[in-house]
Amino acid sequence: MRTSLLVAALGLALAAALPGGAPLAQPDPEATMDRSLLQRQDLPYRFSAVDLDSVDGQRHYRLWLGRPLQAPPAAGYPVVWMLDGNAAVGALDESTLRRLADGDAPLLVAIGYRTPLRIDRAGRTFDYTPASPGQADQRDPLNGLPSGGADAFLDLLRDGMRPAVAAQAPLDTARQTLWGHSYGGLLVLHALFTRPGEFARYAAASPSLWWRDGAILGERAGLEQRLRGKRAELLLWRGSAEPASPRGSLKAEPGQAMARLVDDLRRVAGLTLDFQPLDGLGHGETLGASLRLLLARPAVERQR
């Protein structure tokens, strides 16, 4: 009952932001990936690439692996999986990598697409959005592109990407983090709500709570049962200058939906939640800011 009330309340908050108002700034569709860090040999990380395709052969991935120079721990490297990998690589910098190397350095896996572009709009629209039950034609409500491939993507990450990465470097599968921004943040919440044991830490920056009128909020029902006997950590970020939706207005109390979700999730046994508002940041700016904040944290610990 509580979850139903939460979904209804958040739906009203999201609906208030939909009509009119200033649109959310969209990323430049022609912006190219910043690859400068990948070629450098003076850093404590070395980057390589692994290519694979979706099961249906329609999407073509390039995984950028950032491996620390130091030897792995006995159990393998902790792993940070980064969605929108082409953009994530561009958000990394020298100081972040050097700081990581001074501690329990994780293996970085940026899940990108084989394109020179920073963002693969069609790929992420399909891969990062949950299926809508009862709809024969799954189309994204914002851009009209095919959507609904989230579970196929998460299955591929588990059954295809993870073994491919493990063939290149030893992984500690008990210390995995999944990070995503915007639609990627939506996928992170979907992964937490539907398969909470597959990662130890879930990190969602500016998740698209508005998507399909807040459909992701309905997936939260039953999380306590799915999480029983397990533990998970959720990190959430949101910029104070973000509207509530792509067509929303800053006057529509844009942080209300996130605040209510945070309040609800704090009550879930076994889930550790940390919400950090990012003062003054807009939607696009939270991508790099959240990733750097995530990587400034110690690697996720093994469950005891």
UniProtKB/Swiss-Prot annotation:
Induction: Expression is induced by the presence of enterobactin in bacterial environment. It holds the Pfam family Esterase. GO terms for molecular function: carboxylic ester hydrolase activity; hydrolase activity, acting on ester bonds. This is Iron(III) enterobactin esterase. GO terms for cellular component: periplasmic space. It catalyses: Fe(III)-enterobactin + 3 H2O + H(+) = Fe(III)-[N-(2,3-dihydroxybenzoyl)-L-serine] + 2 N-(2,3-dihydroxybenzoyl)-L-serine; Fe(III)-enterobactin + H2O = Fe(III)-[N-(2,3-dihydroxybenzoyl)-L-serine]3 + H(+); Fe(III)-[N-(2,3-dihydroxybenzoyl)-L-serine]3 + H2O + H(+) = Fe(III)-[N-(2,3-dihydroxybenzoyl)-L-serine]2 + N-(2,3-dihydroxybenzoyl)-L-serine; Fe(III)-[N-(2,3-dihydroxybenzoyl)-L-serine]2 + H2O + H(+) = Fe(III)-[N-(2,3-dihydroxybenzoyl)-L-serine] + N-(2,3-dihydroxybenzoyl)-L-serine. It comes from Pseudomonas aeruginosa (strain ATCC 15692 / DSM 22644 / CIP 104116 / JCM 14847 / LMG 12228 / 1C / PRS 101 / PAO1). Disruption phenotype: Deletion of the gene strongly inhibits Fe uptake via enterobactin. The active site is at 182 (charge relay system), 242 (charge relay system), 283 (charge relay system). Its main location: periplasm. Belongs to the esterase D family. Its EC number is 3.1.1.108.
